[in-house]
């Protein structure tokens, strides 16, 4: 008996250190990937991350299976094997099918899903007989919904050619979103004081999770053009209708997410700090109004202020969450050694507390860093796009993702009042997992579309450059916007852009867009001769230039004097030229 106890303690202690080490290494590699420039090194890191994911799943599930006997143990072992086989094979398949995908983002998604699989399995399979009977099918449902979501992620990029047309469907997205929320408000049964879900074939869906995607698409489409006062007011009214319906449904967590996404996307589109300040003021007024109008908001604020005075009733949930986080310490109690099921609705609303109790504070910190890595990665993609529709959608998805994490972790740690939202990709909940995977799947689709267009243009440009060099062709100075004062050298990006800026390309070209040191998502038209896609998707290129070393190396005056690039500015064509030079 003593030997068995010793072996159990040894296995648990070893497991928690190994789990933390594996997860920490995976997260560190995700951050190091920002500095990787060589394709071979990048592929090697991807493979290492896949192996780490498999090792994490094997080690964590073996620890749980060590204490789960009988049919439940066999069920857990089989489920673990299916999870490993599916995730690893799917990561390889995604790389093969979508060679230009952002695989580090996809790897992060799969690792977060793995943490969720382990946590949900532990809660379901190891506990009281009553708890196991109640939650026994949750790990299987979680795996099924995650698998379906990943399959959608695989399929979505095949429709990338249609994404550009969605910028004209803003009203349609808004109408669909408002209609879906209104129907649920009218027909959904009340659950925990809110009317936000309905059940089909044993699966409970929360439509507001999917409406988030329509909502971001609606805002991106409506704000991708010129943001006039009239348009801003119109968009604000439609966004407010979404929020009001959610408030009427008592889904205040989702209402808060919708409002913050609207505010940040409008701020990005307008570029005005006054918009952000006005939005914050409006949000403060709304928070006070909610506190005065809704009794359950008052209860949650009172719980947040001092849950331990109400520990026997309303404060029990958050008090148990605080106990769990503090009890776990730095390294955690070890899988199966905590009491996560003592927290009501732990698998959906308090997953971060359960993970911190058994896997430790260090593991949870790295978990948050991995979530932050996803946010930074998506934000960097948004900043790299010149296409406003691409930029706004990606930015909205990033804000939606990180703000939901802030709400759930902040609520569980008593940093802010509870909102009842899930931890994306980790908490139990089919709607949450499916909608998050769909939202991030569109982010991947936009990235693939951008990379393909950039690669297609660069291939065409290199071919033209080689042809110009072979023929020793002079620069084309016809219709020179500078009246011949400043001309590109033969074969330079500007020479190529100016020579081909005809009707087949659909708009003006900027020097900034075709700098060899910068990539721009500005290639979407079809060349009349070859059918290849390259040319601007939109003609509203920025006219405020940036100073980059060497950006004027390809320029010279017609009398042979070199052009230094000092005191530069841009004209309405977007071309750089010396300050004071007239057209």
Give the residues covered by each predicted segment.
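TM-adjacent membrane-interface loops and short helices in multi-pass inner/ER membrane proteins
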Residues: 307-352, 362-363
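P-loop potassium selectivity filter motif centered on the GYG triad
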Residues: 217, 223, 320-334, 424, ...
């Amino acid at each position: 008996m003593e030997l068995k106890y010793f072996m159990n303690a040894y296995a648990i202690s070893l497991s928690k250190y190994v789990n933390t080490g594996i997860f920490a290494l995976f997260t560190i590699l995700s951050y190091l990937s920002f500095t990787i420039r060589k394709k071979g090194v990048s592929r090697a890191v991807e493979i290492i991350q896949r192996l780490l994911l498999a090792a994490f799943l094997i080690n964590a599930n073996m620890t749980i299976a060590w204490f789960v006997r009988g049919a439940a143990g066999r069920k857990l072992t089989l489920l673990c094997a299916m999870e490993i086989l599916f995730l690893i094979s799917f990561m390889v398949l995604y790389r093969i099918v979508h060679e230009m995908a952002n695989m580090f983002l996809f790897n992060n998604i799969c690792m977060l899903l793995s943490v969720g699989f382990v946590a949900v399995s532990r809660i379901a399979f190891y506990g009281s007989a009553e708890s196991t009977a109640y939650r026994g099918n949750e790990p299987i449902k979680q795996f099924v919904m995650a698998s379906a979501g990943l399959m959608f992620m695989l399929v979505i990029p095949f429709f990338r050619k249609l994404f550009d047309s969605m910028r004209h469907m803003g009203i349609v997205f808004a109408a669909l979103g408002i209609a879906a929320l209104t129907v649920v408000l009218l027909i959904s049964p009340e659950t925990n004081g809110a009317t936000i879900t309905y059940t089909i074939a044993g699966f409970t869906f929360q439509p507001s999770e999917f409406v988030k995607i329509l909502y971001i698409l609606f805002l991106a489409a409506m704000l991708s053009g010129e943001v006039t006062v009239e348009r801003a007011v119109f968009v604000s009214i439609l966004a407010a209708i979404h929020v009001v319906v959610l408030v009427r449904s008592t889904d205040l967590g989702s209402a808060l997410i919708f409002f913050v996404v609207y505010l940040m996307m409008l701020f990005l589109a307008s570029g005005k700090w006054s918009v952000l300040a006005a939005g914050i003021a409006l949000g403060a007024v709304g928070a006070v109004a909610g506190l005065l109008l809704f009794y359950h908001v008052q209860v949650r604020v009172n719980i947040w202020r001092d849950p331990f005075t109400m520990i026997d009733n309303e404060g029990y949930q958050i008090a148990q969450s605080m106990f769990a986080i503090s009890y776990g310490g730095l390294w955690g109690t070890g899988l199966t050694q905590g009491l996560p099921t003592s927290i009501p609705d732990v698998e959906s609303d308090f997953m971060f507390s359960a993970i911190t109790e058994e896997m430790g504070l260090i593991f949870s910190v790295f978990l948050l860093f991995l979530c932050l890595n996803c946010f930074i990665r998506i934000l960097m993609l948004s900043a790299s796009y010149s296409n406003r529709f691409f930029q706004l959608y990606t930015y909205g998805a990033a804000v939606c993702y990180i703000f939901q994490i802030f709400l759930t972790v902040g609520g569980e740690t008593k940093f802010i009042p509870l909102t009842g939202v899930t931890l994306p990709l980790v908490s139990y909940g089919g709607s949450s997992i499916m909608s998050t995977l769909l939202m991030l799947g569109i982010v991947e689709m936009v990235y693939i579309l951008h990379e393909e267009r950039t690669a297609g243009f660069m291939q065409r440009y290199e071919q033209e450059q080689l042809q110009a060099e072979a023929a020793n062709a002079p620069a084309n100075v016809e219709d020179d916007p500078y009246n011949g004062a400043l001309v590109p050298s033969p074969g330079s990006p500007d020479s190529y852009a100016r020579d081909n800026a005809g009707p087949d390309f659909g708009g003006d070209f900027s020097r900034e867009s075709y700098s060899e040191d910068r990539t721009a998502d500005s290639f979407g038209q079809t060349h009349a001769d070859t059918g290849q896609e390259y040319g601007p998707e939109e003609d509203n290129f920025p006219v405020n230039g940036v100073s980059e070393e060497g950006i004027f190396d390809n320029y010279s005056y017609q009398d042979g004097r070199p052009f230094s690039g000092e005191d530069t500015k841009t004209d309405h064509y977007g071309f750089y030229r010396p300050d004071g030079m007239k057209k």
